[in-house]
C-alpha cells in the first residue's frame, strides 16, 4: 500500500509541474515502472540499446576488474611473500641454529663443570663427618653371632634408619652452606635434588667399600641397605627435603621456564627493534623486492617503494597494537547491534592515483567458556591464549574430511559421556528381560547374560512395563492393517521427538537462532535407544509398503570410535556371526548376512532379510536382542530405514493468488542505522532530490548506472525470466564479489544430475571411486555414476545452485563453484534413510561445507537426526550447513513437522517459497518457530536431463537459492583465507535478509534471502566488525584522504581477532605495483576476563574537509539502493511511513482539485481553438466578420419573436438546413420570399442535416422589441448599401414560411447535450451567443 501511494504521489507531482497544454505524447503510465523502481527493485529489464557497447563494456571491465580479481591477486602475493620469506629466513635460521647449538653446548659444559665442582666440594666436606657417624653403627653390626634373631634384626634396621636420617641432615646442612657461598656461579641453575642423590650415593658406596674390606659377611646386608637408601630414603623423603631444601629456590622446571622467558624476551626485544625499521627481504621476484615495513599500529607489505612513500595511514584509534583491544560486554539480547565506532584515515601524499579495496583476513575466535577456573583467574589473557591450540591450515577443502570432536565445550563433553553410559541400554535391557521371561525355551543363554547386568531399579521398571505389552500389540496390529504407512507414536517411542518439542519452548520468540540439542540441563536430552517393539513395528510397516528382499537396520555408533581398529572389527564380526547362527537355526534356506560400515559418520547398516511377518515376529525380537547384546556398548541408536520424498510440482498456469488464502505481505525497504545515520534509509527516503529529478525530468548519469551493471551480466539472462535472481539481488552480489570460488563445494543430495548437461558439466564434480567411500562398486555407481537416471528433480535443483555462465541456457546463483551430485532418490521420487546417510557421509569425506536437501518426511528418523547433528563437527569443527526445504502441503511445520527441515540445530536452515508478488507461496509450508527464511520457489526455470529446460514450482526450488547465496558467502571467506563457522554463515543470511511485513507472522524472520547484503557483510568484516558499503572500493587521488568508519559488536562471548587489509593498486593498468596494509584488530566480549573494562563507544573526533576523496559512482548506486541491513526491523520506519502516508493523501487531494480545474480550462481552450479555425472568406478584414455575426444574431431574434404570443408556456423546436445557413453571406441581403413552404419543408425534413434545438421560455417581454427591429430593417451590404424596409405584410409572409412544432411531441431522447436552455430574460443574450456558436459549427 505504501508503495502504491508513493508511486501515485510522484506521478501527481510530475503532472502538476508539467505545464504544457497541447502535448499528445504525454503518457504517464509508461513511467510508472521508473517511479516504482526508486522504491523497490522488482524486475530488472536488460537493455541492449547502448551506443558503442564494446568500448563501454571494456571500460566497465577495466574499472572493476581489480574488484573481482583482488582476492586472487592478494592470495598470490601472500603466497609469493611467504615463499621468499621462508627461503630467506631458512638461511638465517641455519646460522642462528648453529649459534644456538654452540651456546647450548657451552652452557651444558659449564653446567656440568659446575656440578662436578659442587659435588667434589660437598664430598670433601662430608666424608670426614660421615665416617665418624658410621663408625658406631658398623661396630654394633659386627658384634654378636652370625645368626641374629628377629629382635636383633629389627634393632639393626632401626639403627640404620637413624643413620640415614642423620646422613640426610648432614647433606642438607652442607648444601645450605654451599648456597651461601658467593664464589659459586649459577646457583639458581643447579638441580639440588640431583646433587643430593649423587652425594648420598657416593658416600654410601664409599662406606660400603670400606665395610667390605673389614668383613665380607655383611655384604648382602649392605647391598640391601644401599637399595633401601636409594629407593626408600630418597623417594619417601623427597617431598620433605624439597620443602626444606628448596625453600625460596627455583626448581628445575622453573629454571627452564626462566630460560624460555629470557629467550622469548630477547626475541621480543629484537622484534621491537625490527618494528621501528624497514625490513627488506633481499630475495627478488619478477616484480622486484617484497618489502615489509612494520609501524606502531599497522604493517605495509608491498613490492614498490612508491606505496611506502605515497600512502600514509592513521590507525591508532583501532589497532590492537595501540589500544590493546576493544572491550564490549556480551549481551545475548543485543548481540546484533553495532555499538562501538572507530575510524581509519587513509591519505595519498604522492603524485599517483591509487585504487583502494577493503577486505578482512585471518579471523580467529577463542571461546573462553570453561577456561577461567578459579585457579586460572589470576593468569593474564596472553597466558590463556597460549593454552588454546592453534588452528590448522585454513584451506580445509582439500583431502579427506573427518569429524573433529576436539572443540567440544566442557558441557558437550560431559553430556557425551552421559550418553555413552548406561542410559542407552536401560530400555533395551528391560525389554530384553521381558522377552527372556516370555520365551525361556528359545533364549536361555541371552536371559542369563542380561540378568547379570540388571539392577533392582531396572527390575522394578520392568514390572511397570509389563502392563503396556498388550496395548502396544494391539496398536501394532492396527497400524499394520491401516492403509497409510504412518504410525501413531507412543510414549516410549521417540525420545528425540519430545526433545525437539522442548527445544522450541526454550527458544526465544522472534529470533532466528536454533538451540543446540546438547543441553545437559534438559532432562529429556537422554538419547535412549528405540525399544524392540518399535523396531518390529518399523519392520512390519516397511514390509507392507516396500516389497524388497532386504531391509536396512541402521545402527549409529559412537562418534569417537575407530571402526577400522582390530577391536571394532572383531566386535562387528562376532555380532554378525551370532546373528547368522540364529538365522540358520530357524530358517534353513538362509545363507548369510551382509552389512555396510560408513566412517567418519560411524554408522553400521545390517541388511535383515524379509523372512518375518506377524506370525514369527517373536523370532525377529530375539534376533534384535542377540544383536544388541553384542553391540549395546558401542551403539547410540538404531532403527530401520525410513522413506523420504522430494518437494516439487509441475508448472501451474493459474494466478498466484487463486489458492492463496493467507494474509498479504508487502515488500518494504528495511531501515539502515549504521554510522550515526549518515547513510540511513530515512534520510534518503525523505530526501527531496528524487522529487526534483522527477519534476524537472533530468536524465542524470546515475539513472543509467543500473543498465550499465545489467549489461555486464551473462547473455543468457536475456533469454528467460530471471525474476528469481533479481529479487534476491544476485546481480549486484556478482558485481561485488564475482561468481564464486571453485574450491567451495556444494553437495546436492537428491535424485542425481545429468553429467552431460551443457549448463552443469563445467561445475559438476563426480567423485572417483575410492575405498574411503566404503561402498561396493555397484553401490557407488548407483549413488554417483548413474546419477543421470532420474526424472529431472536433481538436475533442476543443481542448475539453480550453480548453472554455468557460458552464454548458453541458464545461470545459477553461484555459477563458479563445485557441485557434487549424489543420488539417493529413485525413479519414483522416493529414497531411504540408509542411502541418505550414506550420501551425507560422502559429503563429509569430500569436505563440502554446504549440503542441499530438497526432500523430507513427516516421520522422525533418529538415525538421520544423529547424522545431521554430527555435521557440526566437520571441517575441523567449523561445521557444514544443511539447507532443507520446508514442504509443499501448506501446513504449519510447528504443528506437523517435516524432517530434516525442522531439526533444531544451529547449522540447519529451513526454507519456504515466495512468489513474484512477494507473498509466501500458497503451497509452501510455514512455521514461525521452525521455518527460517523465504526464497523464490514459484515458476522457476532451470535445467532437466537431455539438455532441456523446464519450469518447476515448490520449496525444492527455494532451498537451492539459499544454497547458492551460502556458496557466495563461503567463496568470499575462502578468498580472504579462512573458513567460517556454519552458524555464523546462517546468521549472516538472517540478518541481511529483506523484511516481508504481514499481519500474521508465518516464519521465524519473515524475510527474503538477500545475496547482495550477505556478500557485503562477509566482505566487510562479518558480524563482529562492519565497514560501510561505500568503502569496498574507491579511488584515492593526489592530495586526498579518506575517513573509513568501522563499527563493532559483541556477536559472541569470547575473544575475536582479525586483520583489516587495505589493498592498494595504481590506476595505471600496466603497472605491476601492489601493496597491502594490515591492521590487527581485537574484540574482547567476555566480562570474566581479568581487568575487563568496557571501551568508550566513540573514538577520536575527525574533521572531514574538502580534501575528502569521493565515493565510487557505480558502487555508491549499489550501496544506496541495496536492501542491505544488519539490523532487525526498525520502529522509526513506522513514523516515516505515517508521515509519507499523509503527505501522499495531501498530494492526491491537491492533484484532484488541480485536475478538475484543468479540465474546465482545457474545454475552453478547445472551444477557442474551434472558433479560431472557423474564419469565412472575407475581403475587408476582421471588422466585417464581427459585423456579420452581430447582424445575424439580431436577425434570428427578430425572426422568431412574433410567433411566441400563442405559445407562452410551450417549448418550440425549429430545424434549419445547411443550405439555408449558407445563403447568409457577407455583403448580401437575404430574400425570405424566395423560400416557399414546400421548399423550406423539404430542406427541414432531410435527415442528414444537423439540427439545432432551441428551447425558449418566457419570451413574452421580448416580443415587441423583436418586431420593432424587424420593421426597422437590416443592412447586409455595408455602410453604402440601401436600407430595405419590411412591411407588416412581408413580415407576416416571412413568418408563414416557417413551420413550428410543439415541444411536447418531441421524445426526451432527442434532446442532446448540445441543447441550450434559456431559463429567464437575463441570459437570453448569452443563450443566443451560444446558439450562434453552435450554428457556425
Swiss-Prot record:
Catalytic center residues: 750, 793, 956
Low complexity: compositionally biased ranges: 422-470, 513-526
PTM per Swiss-Prot/TrEMBL: Proteolytically cleaved at the N-terminus to generate a 74kDa intermediate which is further processed into a 72kDa form. The first maturation cleavage is autocatalytic, occurs in the ER and is necessary for the subsequent SUB2 trafficking to the microneme. The second cleavage may be mediated by PMX/plasmepsin X.
Record-listed E.C. numbers: 3.4.21.62
Biological-process GO terms, alphabetical: proteolysis
Primary location class: membrane
Lineage: superkingdom: Eukaryota
Pfam families named in the record: Peptidase_S8, Pro_sub2
Subcellular location: Cell membrane; Cytoplasmic vesicle, Secretory vesicle, Microneme membrane
Catalytic activity from the UniProt record: Hydrolysis of proteins with broad specificity for peptide bonds, and a preference for a large uncharged residue in P1. Hydrolyzes peptide amides
Basic and acidic residues compositional bias, start-end: 498-511
Topology class, membrane: Single-pass type I membrane protein
Glycosylation sites per record: 157, 335, 445, 449, 488, 546, 570, 637, 724, 816, 852, 888, 946, 1005, 1101
PROSITE patterns referenced in this protein's UniProt entry, alphabetically: ASP_PROTEASE, SUBTILASE, SUBTILASE_HIS, SUBTILASE_SER
Spans traversing the lipid bilayer: 1133-1153
Domain remarks: The propeptide domain acts as an intramolecular chaperone for the folding of the catalytic domain. Also acts as an inhibitor of the catalytic domain thereby regulating SUB2 activity during secretion.
Function field: Serine protease which plays an essential role in the shedding of AMA1, MSP1 and MSP7 from the surface of the invading merozoite; this step is essential for productive invasion and the release of the adhesion between the erythrocyte and the merozoite. May cleave TRAMP/PTTRAMP, thereby shedding TRAMP from the merozoite surface during erythrocyte invasion.
UniProt-recorded name of the protein: Subtilisin-like protease 2
Taxonomic source organism: Plasmodium falciparum (isolate Palo Alto / Uganda)
Name of the coding gene: SUB2
